[in-house]
Amino acid sequence: MVLGGYPVSYLLLCGQAALLLGNLLLLHCVSRSHSHNATAEPELTSAGAAHPEGSPGAASWEYGDPHSPVILCSYLPDEFIECEDPVDHVGNTTAFQELGYGCLKFGGQAYRDVEHTRVQCRALDGIECASPRTFLRENKPCIKYTGHYFITTLLYSFFLGCFGVDRFCLGHTGTAVGKLLTLGGLGIWWFVDLILLITGGLMPSDGSNWCTIY
């Protein structure tokens, strides 16, 4: 069959060739656009903050635009960071002054009795934030927990206090031996320790606080 002086098969072949050429051009344009976006992305984001070179799991930006949705890492809530324990200087004032932060003593019952310091914190992996991912977080209390529970110690003191079990558990070994040898000071020492425990006068010897039961 002839259409306009050209066989139909010839026209169909030309149409298929034109369609194939168009697909090749489209794929070429898409690949060029993708490579251009991949090159431009590290330079500037839509939020107006520059990507640094680093691992993908610890993405961070340099803080520049205050209207950007990306906040400083130091402003992240506690659930998005992990912090080290406060540095224990064991009363060494010189070490405290050289480092600039840390705890000279731990423990305390009232807020005014507890020292507060800065601790080293870092943003969790996968959290995107601006500025260095490691920073100092302010106003952390100088308290630690070493497995001592008030209720357990009180029960030890009430039922086994005459044998010094309560003071052994709290680490007061010397006075615990004396309490054991005197059978709780004939009951007087046993009663005094009960009062001291209830009022907060008898605490763990390592300066730790009572563990909280939730």
From Swiss-Prot:
Glycans are attached at N37, N92. InterPro entries: TM2 (IPR007829), TM2D1-3-like (IPR050932). Its main location: membrane. One of its GO terms (cellular component) is membrane. It is found in: Membrane. Residues 36-144, 204-214 are extracellular. The keyword Membrane applies. Residues 147-195 form the TM2 domain. The keyword Cell membrane does not apply. It is a multi-pass membrane protein. The chain crosses the membrane at residues 145-165, 183-203. Keywords: Glycoprotein, Membrane, Signal, Transmembrane, Transmembrane helix. Residues 1-35 form the signal peptide. Residues 166-182 are cytoplasmic. Belongs to the TM2 family. This is TM2 domain-containing protein 2. The gene is TM2D2.
